[in-house]
A protein has these predicted regions:
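Post-transcriptional modification and biogenesis factors for structured RNAs
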Residues: 1-144
Length: 144
């Protein structure tokens, strides 16, 4: 999703997955070389290297829905590990910046990749998909 949208991926350790050639191939990430990615040793490292960053936090614990947020062009959208989410110690300091994707019942959470795509495309929609291809083309035939 990041490669398709020209979005930089910021990874904050410890990661919930391994970044090695075998793991990337298994995940079908043959476009890894095209990915704009930055890795940080921890959350404080991220904050130090991105001073003044506007961060929205995706969490099942939030009060507001992701579509209620007005995303700025250079904001960050943080997602936690699929198994645990963003640590509550971080969430409680940013309650007004937390948002959720609505779900029914007592479902724990959506797949991390799906959640990223849902929220990222809402942020891009609010920016009128700036810089993105808005039209597709047939390869062999022509539209009538």
């Amino acid at each position: 999703t990041c490669v398709a949208t020209g979005t930089r991926l910021h990874l904050i350790e410890p990661l919930g997955f391994k970044i090695n050639e075998k793991a990337l191939k298994r995940a079908g990430m043959d476009y890894w070389d095209d990915l704009d990615v930055t890795t940080y040793i921890d959350y404080n490292d991220f904050l130090e290297k991105n001073p003044g960053a506007k961060i929205y936090m995706a969490t099942t614990k939030a009060h507001q829905v992701y579509t209620d947020v007005k995303y700025e062009p250079d904001c960050y959208i943080m997602f936690g590990k699929e198994s645990a989410g963003i640590p509550e110690e971080i969430l409680v300091e940013h309650e007004e910046d937390c948002m959720r994707i609505p779900m029914i019942g007592e479902i724990r959470s959506l797949n991390l990749g799906n959640s990223v795509a849902i929220v990222l495309y809402e942020a891009l929609r609010q920016q009128n998909f700036a810089g993105m291809n808005l039209e597709g083309h047939l390869h062999e035939l022509h539209w009538k």
